[in-house]
Regions:
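Hydrophobic faces of well-ordered beta-strands that scaffold small-molecule active sites
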Residues: 14-16, 44-48, 113-116, 133-136, ...
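Alpha-helix-loop-beta-strand connector modules within alpha/beta enzyme cores
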Residues: 1-16, 70, 74, 280-292
Length: 308
């Protein structure tokens, strides 16, 4: 897909989110990313992850319980291939000998790297090497903010060299002419999306929480209530003015400097997705460009004091 998109676009940055590294040969990933960086003429962003569900790992015969160690070992090997004219490596899970990358990267030292993660170990490791982090919907905002604060602390301690990483929030989004139109058109698709995704075998685990179990309780009720989801910022929906305000609010609560929108969800028709995208591009993006957050130096959330 990215290869095709690279030849039909000129300005937009493109990227996978994510390569599930335990399921890939690191040499293949290093070469493919280098090729895509050339095809996009340096417009590539690259997302890496350890995986979100054991079902896919079972299909590949890869141990789910060792995914985190495998992912970080694979990333070390990939970066080693990018950084050296000839590279050899022997680890617990992967090895290579005298690998020469035949495709020079356009972006130096490599394309910007992203990793969605919430475990303390992975957050700190990502921050320590300057890999950007991103969070998606299922956790409540207080969990996301705590994760971002951990990331910021680790980054400030490590002060890694190179380009500064970003802190991102990803949300499903639907923009229409009015708040009512957006809610009415998106409601069934939002509910369908969570009913399908919450029970899917491939999404049997998310971070250190079981997504299916989590969605069986209070959080599932919250997410299946479209009005609650819009109010608490789990779902971005409304007129261009409302959507602009919603994104600014959740970015401020989280201390995030990047927003990723998933415009196609549920069973939305193509024309609905495109209309939402056009409204976002024409009316929301110009306003968001005026809104900036220094995510890496964002003040830490105040501790909550229980009422007595």
């Amino acid at each position: 897909f990215l290869g095709a998109a690279s030849q039909r676009t000129k300005k937009i940055r493109l990227g996978p989110l994510v390569y599930v590294l335990p399921l890939w040969n690191p040499i293949r990933v290093a070469e493919e990313v280098a090729l895509l960086d050339n095809l996009t003429q340096g417009r590539l962003e690259c997302g890496f992850g350890a995986g979100v569900g054991p079902f896919t790992f079972a299909a590949y015969g890869v141990p789910w319980d060792e995914k985190r160690k495998m992912a970080w070992e694979a990333l070390r090997m990939i970066k080693g291939i990018w950084d050296n004219p000839s590279y050899s490596y022997e680890g617990e899970y992967f090895k290579c000998k005298n690998v020469e990358l035949g495709i020079p990267l356009v972006q130096k030292p490599h394309p910007p790297l992203w990793m969605p993660t919430r475990s303390r170990e992975s957050l700190e490791e990502a921050a320590s090497i300057g890999v950007s982090t991103i969070q998606w919907v299922p956790p409540r905002m207080k969990v996301i903010r705590a994760a971002f604060d951990q990331y910021r602390d680790a980054y400030q301690r490590a002060q890694p060299a190179g380009r500064k990483p970003h802190i991102g929030l990803m949300r499903e989004i639907y923009v229409a002419a009015s708040d009512k139109q957006a809610r009415d058109e998106a409601k069934d698709h939002w509910i369908y999306f969570w009913q399908r995704r919450g029970g899917a075998r491939a999404y049997g685990g998310y971070g250190h929480e079981n997504l299916t179990t989590m969605l069986d309780g209070e959080r599932k009720k919250e997410l299946l209530d479209i009005d609650h989801s819009i109010t608490d910022g789990s779902f971005i929906s409304g007129s261009p003015e409302t959507v602009t305000r919603q994104i600014q609010e959740i970015a401020s609560k989280a201390g995030a400097d990047t927003f990723l929108g998933e415009f196609a969800f549920g069973a939305l028709e193509h024309h609905q997705v495109m209309n939402s995208l056009r409204l976002f591009t024409d009316q929301v993006m110009p306003e968001l460009r005026k809104f900036e957050i220094d995510a890496l130096n964002y003040p830490k959330a105040e501790p909550q004091v229980a009422a007595t």
